[in-house]
């Protein structure tokens, strides 16, 4: 797999990971806890009491409390109290929303805003009209005890809803995938949640028998139709949908785990090496006529694919030319403790193209007929020189592969089908992980966060398959195995001669 394909694949996973990161909030406070107490009266009015804890991470002027309003609804008899700071407040009607702007100060003169590290408790109490709906057959309370208008996560929530009568009611907590818990106790509906994320909500919905309300309900909405069965059907449909989504999510989780076995199957089928009875009887002699760079191309390693050359191929070719007398090596004292090594070109007769190209690269750093490694090192510190060397080195590697390892020759030494299958699996895994991850983020269901984690894990497996060296997924042929063993034995025979 070439570098561009790998880079594209890694870019996909980066986009996926960035898409699931939370957006940085502009607010400078957190909300560790909230307590909400709601009283439903016989005339349809509800009274809301809120106790909200704030922790400020920097200095601040105050906070907002936005109360969304639907048609004909209104907030009345508002009272505000603050512990932990001096305060003022202002009510702003924004059309469809009542905004309560609470200014916070750390001095009685109300001239200095609060500082970082301040903990404040805000109390709000107000009457809310036309929230309860009265139908022909039943009354309904549908109220968000914590709404989705908040721009900060809530650490923990406790809420209680008190109805006119102690009789247990039919009730539901929405959304159906919410982790909030509810129970009926002493005629009250108790709700708790270990946290509500920004943009999420916790809603209570209850059917109230008409006999619990007075004959006159001026503070309720009156709707001339039967709605009890419709509400029950709607809630059941939502619950059934969530059950289905959660089941599908669990199946997808198991499927992603099962698919992780495919790379192991590919390795088992295509990556295991053939057994040989090779014995290095002649290890005291150079046992192969293949160029050192050829053997290097057949060798794998961390981050190195079979068939690619690295700097060791370049170095081994230099050593081979020295041993064959084509290059000479010399040194002279640089200081009392160090020496400078030089190469000299003795002959280029009979050299192969890749060897002549190597000599030409070295001659770029020739001074007075000697190739100085110290001078070469100094030159490569300059960006232009380093880039020029890298380009010539890359051309040298590619020309060698074209001459000695064209595809039909390479296939005689290495079977890369398994490596190709690893690449295909990696691409497919990334695409599937992105799809599953995106769906688990944007389609809410119980366990969606777990499915997102499985998608991330599966994407990591896909990336690993894309970047792993080809020697893991592929395998040497018998000819390649023997050639590689011969080449490794011959490395010990290469010595620099003077």
Explain the meaning of each model-derived region.
Residues 10-19:
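Bacterial N-terminal signal peptides
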Residues 2-9, 22, 26-498:
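Acidic, Ser/Thr/Pro-rich intrinsically disordered cytosolic tails and loops
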């Amino acid at each position: 797999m070439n570098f561009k394909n790998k880079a594209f694949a890694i870019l996909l996973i980066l986009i996926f990971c960035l898409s699931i990161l939370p957006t940085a909030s502009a607010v400078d406070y957190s909300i560790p806890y909230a307590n909400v107490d709601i009283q439903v009266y016989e005339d349809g009015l509800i009274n809301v009491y809120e106790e909200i804890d704030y922790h400020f991470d920097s200095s601040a002027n105050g906070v907002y409390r936005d109360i969304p309003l639907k048609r004909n609804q209104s907030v009345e008899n508002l009272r505000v109290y603050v512990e932990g700071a001096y305060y003022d407040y202002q009510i702003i009607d924004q059309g469809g929303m009542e905004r309560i702007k609470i200014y916070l100060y750390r001095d009685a003169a109300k001239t200095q805003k609060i500082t970082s590290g301040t903990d404040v408790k805000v109390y709000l109490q107000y009457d809310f009209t036309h929230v309860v709906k009265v139908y022909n057959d039943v009354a309904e309370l549908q109220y968000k005890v914590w709404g989705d208008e908040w721009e900060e996560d809530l650490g923990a929530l406790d809420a209680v809803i008190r109805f006119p009568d102690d009789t247990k009611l039919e009730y539901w907590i929405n959304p159906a995938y919410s982790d909030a818990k509810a129970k009926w106790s002493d005629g009250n509906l108790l709700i708790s949640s270990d946290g509500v994320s920004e943009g999420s909500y916790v809603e209570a919905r209850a059917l109230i028998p008409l006999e619990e309300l007075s004959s006159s309900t001026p503070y309720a909405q009156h709707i001339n139709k039967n709605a009890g069965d419709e509400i029950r059907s709607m809630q059941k449909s939502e619950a059934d949908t969530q059950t289905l989504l959660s089941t599908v999510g669990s199946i997808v989780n198991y499927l992603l785990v099962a698919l992780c076995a495919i790379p192991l199957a590919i390795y088992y089928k295509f990556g295991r090496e053939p057994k040989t009875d090779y014995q290095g009887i002649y290890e005291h002699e150079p046992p192969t006529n293949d160029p050192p760079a050829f053997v290097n191309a057949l060798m794998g390693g961390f981050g190195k694919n079979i068939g690619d050359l690295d700097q060791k191929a370049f170095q081994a070719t230099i050593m081979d030319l020295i041993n064959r007398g084509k290059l000479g090596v010399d040194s002279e004292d640089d200081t009392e403790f160090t020496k400078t090594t030089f190469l000299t070109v003795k002959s280029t007769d009979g050299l192969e193209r890749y060897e002549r190209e190597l000599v030409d690269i070295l001659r770029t750093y020739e001074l007075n007929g000697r190739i100085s490694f110290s001078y070469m090192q100094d030159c490569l510190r300059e960006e232009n020189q380093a880039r020029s060397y890298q380009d010539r080195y890359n051309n040298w590697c590619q020309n060698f592969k074209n001459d000695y390892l064209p595809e039909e020759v390479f296939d005689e030494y290495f079977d890369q089908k398994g490596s190709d299958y690893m690449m295909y699996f990696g691409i497919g895994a990334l695409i599937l992980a992105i799809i599953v991850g995106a769906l688990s983020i944007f389609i809410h269901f119980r366990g969606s966060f777990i499915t997102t984690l499985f998608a991330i894990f599966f994407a990591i497996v896909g990336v690993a398959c894309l970047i792993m060296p080809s020697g893991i997924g592929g395998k040497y042929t018998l000819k390649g195995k023997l050639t590689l063993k011969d080449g490794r034995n011959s490395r010990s025979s290469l010595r620099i001669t003077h």
